[in-house]
Every structure is written in structure tokens, then in C-alpha cells.
Amino acid sequence: TIVLSGALEHKDDMGNGGVIRPGDVQVMSAGEGVHHSEFNPSPIEPVSLFQLWIYPHTQNIASRYDQASFDWQNMKNDQKTLVSSDNRPDSLLIHANASVTMGVYEANQETTYVLNNAKY
């Protein structure tokens, strides 16, 4: 989950809880099973977010939760890997053949993104 504006509150039966705000990225692996809730804690401010569900490459692993703050709001004409399966520096770990990279660019700015794995 990547919150763009507003806030999203998270609670789960693993004992995790907190508010995810703009700049925060949350990773949750259901693994062997987890009960959780996510909701907008504000009665007046809307929340805008990306929530990606990615199929894991490993089954029956322990459930887990992780969250980190990234300064992507202050990025300009740059990109940052937020989530990866190969322990890239400063990214959150997922158990899937995927990565999530976010870029922030000015209008008409060009960029190149090279895939790290030839099978994609």
C-alpha cells in the first residue's frame, strides 16, 4: 500500500497497528493467514492510495508486516525502488518475482527504466 494523500489506519492480529501517511509504504504478507482491517481514520479528509496485490513465489511462509517512510514527495525527475524481492538497498522485502518502483517527474520529462531481470 502506498498512500498518496490522507491517511490509512491499519490493525491486524499479529499485533501491528498504526497510521500509514503520504510517503509511507506498507507491505503485508498473508502467509499462513492474517486478519486485518484498514480504514480512513478521518471523517472529513479523503484518502488516496495505491494498493497492489502481488502473487508470491513462495507459499506457506510466515505472515509478516513491514512499513517504511520514503521521501518520494520531494523527489524530482527521479525514481526509487520501494519494494523488491532481491534485498535492494532501502527497499521493503517481498516474496514475489516483482519490484515496485515509483518515479516523480515534471511534465515532458523523459526517463529510461531498465528491467533488472531478463525474464520480465
Each PLM stretch: what is its role?
Residues 4, 21, 32, 46-50, ...:
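A generic structural signal for short beta-strands and their flanking turns/coil linkers
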Residues 19-20, 42-45, 93-94, 115:
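Solvent-exposed alpha-helices and their adjacent loops that cap or buttress functional pockets
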Residues 68-70, 76-120:
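Acidic/His-leaning functional-site neighborhoods
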Residues 12-29, 72-75, 109, 115-116:
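Short acidic-glycine-tyrosine-enriched beta hairpin
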Residues 1-9, 53-56, 102-106, 116-120:
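Short, conserved beta-strand element in jelly-roll/cupin
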Residues 61-66:
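A non-catalytic, helix-rich entry segment at domain boundaries
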Residues 13-15, 30-60:
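Ligand-binding loop in jelly-roll beta-barrel domains
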Residues 1, 26, 51, 79-81:
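Structural motif
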